[in-house]
């Protein structure tokens, strides 16, 4: 099937989806309605671009016809030639764009995410850097108009982040932040370093798509839920009523503790949201590992222990090791202006996929 047949098939399916989504039987089936709505949303941009492309093709035909019929009218002929030139340039741009739009879509791209950041090797300095990463993502979320909610956090004695779990909600969050999973390395002189030596520390980032209950159902028999009193600083109990929740997925051993909220139900709901995402992600990673060669051919789906980026403070440098990108803009990037890095990762990923399709 050539590209034009593929595009026509996408448009035909889009029109079919419009009819299905107005079918009362589909509307009453929540899971199916959500799946079809997501499919329609995922194909809308491609269909819009294809329809615009077809109009450009028509414009080329009209301009060529106008040149033939100019009959010595120099002004009309010149206008038609200019129209033809612009339309041919637009045709080339649309063809490149449509190739990218036809690439297989990541079904999670439009989803919200659960973001986890942990201080790793480097003690207090790693925890402080984890805090810097948290601030970077919070500020980036602001620039995108996303909602950023810290669901659970644990700090150390110097104000660094031992672990933080956040929900980031908005348009196409996963499509932009999915490349952030991995080990982030920092090189800088710690505040406590009297000799001025540069230390190296790491923090790890995990990005998981939010998973709705209708998408992934966890058998309640597989969960152990413990209720206990929330603890404050110094370990004292801060609630007379037990509101904190510890939830364990028995088959995988995945555990979530939640005590940020004032009520047991709210803590339970948040814990369930996180554990559903972690369990779904756990099995998704197993499936990806079984397709190891394919997984390694793309950026953003590699080994999560892999060092993906270095932040060098003395040189104001950020290097993304996966794509060989180096920017002397560390202060800018940590202030939340991440577009240059993220756009480069998206472009690299698309290029790799296009090359794989053309082989």
Swiss-Prot record:
- Kindly give the SMART domains that the UniProt entry links to this protein: PCRF
PTM: Methylated by PrmC. Methylation increases the termination efficiency of RF1.
* Disulfide partners: none
Query: What would be an example GO MF term here?
Result: translation release factor activity, codon specific
User: Where does it live in the cell?
Assistant: Cytoplasm
Q: Name one GO cellular component term.
A: cytoplasm
Query: Which residues are reported to carry the modification N5-methylglutamine?
Result: 236
* Entries under Pfam families matching the protein: PCRF (PF03462), RF-1 (PF00472)
What protein name does the entry list?
Answer: Peptide chain release factor 1
What organism, scientifically named, is this protein from?
Answer: Streptococcus agalactiae serotype III (strain NEM316)
